Curated annotation (Swiss-Prot):
It comes from the Archaea. It catalyses: pretRNA = a 3'-half-tRNA molecule with a 5'-OH end + a 5'-half-tRNA molecule with a 2',3'-cyclic phosphate end + an intron with a 2',3'-cyclic phosphate and a 5'-hydroxyl terminus. SUPFAM superfamilies: tRNA-intron endonuclease catalytic domain-like (SSF53032), tRNA-intron endonuclease N-terminal domain-like (SSF55267). This is tRNA-splicing endonuclease. Keywords: Lyase, tRNA processing. Transmembrane segments: none annotated. Its EC number is 4.6.1.16. Endonuclease that removes tRNA introns. Cleaves pre-tRNA at the 5'- and 3'-splice sites to release the intron. The products are an intron and two tRNA half-molecules bearing 2',3' cyclic phosphate and 5'-OH termini. Recognizes a pseudosymmetric substrate in which 2 bulged loops of 3 bases are separated by a stem of 4 bp. PANTHER family: TRNA-SPLICING ENDONUCLEASE SUBUNIT SEN34, TRNA-SPLICING ENDONUCLEASE SUBUNIT SEN34-RELATED. Belongs to the tRNA-intron endonuclease family. Archaeal short subfamily. The active site is at Y110, H116, K147.
């Protein structure tokens, strides 16, 4: 992407009204959510695109750095850093990544060009204790909406390992 697109901070997300943002980022690459003539990005999406040099984020007159956006994200969500690492890893692999909060997970993951997502991804730290009930509930929801539940485990070095969780019938 040649031209850096301006976005403006608005609460816990950023937006742009530029047609180029809508065309290049939303329509062509699956970023953000379109509401009227505005493209809204989550702070995780904004951090990713800032790190790639595709956008800049303004808070009034002040331009925010990647670290500023991550810091804002961590104020809203203490796990922002690990969720960002998983988001970045999936995007770098060519997948489209959207929120899955309504499904009790962190991300819905689509193959490029797919209309429906294949996976629901739940992000955890390697040191985090997991309840069997949490895993079962998420796997049940994923199964109910015909998705595969994936556990994304981030270790202390920031490496991500993915585990597929599915029902087995005997």
């Amino acid at each position: 992407m040649k031209t850096v697109i301006e976005f403006y901070l608005s609460g816990d997300r950023v937006y742009s009204e530029r047609e180029k943002a809508i065309n290049q980022l939303h329509i062509n690459r699956g970023y953000g959510e379109l509401k009227g003539k505005r493209l809204f990005l989550s702070l995780i999406e904004a951090a990713y695109l800032l790190e790639k040099g595709w956008i800049k984020v303004l808070d009034g007159e002040r331009e925010l750095s990647f670290y500023d956006v991550v810091s804002l994200g961590k104020k809203k969500d203490e796990d922002f850093d690990v969720k960002y690492l998983v988001y970045k890893d999936l995007r770098d692999r060519g997948y489209i990544v959207k929120s899955a909060l309504k499904f009790g997970s962190h991300y819905r993951v689509y193959r490029k060009g797919a209309e429906h997502s294949d996976w629901l991804v739940w992000v955890v730290r390697e040191s985090q204790k997991l309840s069997p009930n949490d895993i079962t509930a998420r796997a049940r929801v994923a199964h109910g909406v015909r998705k595969t539940m994936v556990l994304a485990v981030v270790d202390e070095d920031g490496d991500v390992v993915y585990y597929k969780v599915e029902w087995t019938k005997f």
